[in-house]
Amino acid sequence: MRPSEKQDNLVRAFKALLKEERFGSQGEIVEALKQEGFENINQSKVSRMLTKFGAVRTRNAKMEMVYCLPTELGVPTVSSSLRELVLDVDHNQALVVIHTGPGAAQLIARMLDSLGKSEGILGVVAGDDTIFITPTLTITTEQLFKSVCELFEYAG
């Protein structure tokens, strides 16, 4: 087998394992890949692959912290899976703040950014699990807060 074929097979197996959303550590991924026949795999290679493919740690359906791959490269739309990532929405006189599951803030912020000024969003800043949203001058923070809560079906 050519080296490029081996690499392609490794990438396919790696992505398939992460889609299972059951691996909480890099060591678990290494062991699973070894069971798939990739004898020369190690933790540092898995770490590089996680970074290369933009993997994040988030909670699965069993509420376990696991590695997973971002599902969409384009601008995401609101779906039930995005709604589940929003843990809390709050606001003050200046900002609306969203708390998400670990690693989910960037994904949700990109979706909010795509809504833009037409929805009253002047700007969005996201960290790993926190998003700050600033309203435009044409909307109050309270109105933006209510819109964001509706968007994510957040009852708060």
Swiss-Prot record:
One of its GO terms (biological process) is regulation of arginine biosynthetic process. The keyword Transcription applies. The keyword Magnesium does not apply. It is found in: Cytoplasm. Keywords: Amino-acid biosynthesis, Arginine biosynthesis, Cytoplasm, DNA-binding, Repressor, Transcription, Transcription regulation. Belongs to the ArgR family. PANTHER family: ARGININE REPRESSOR. This is Arginine repressor.
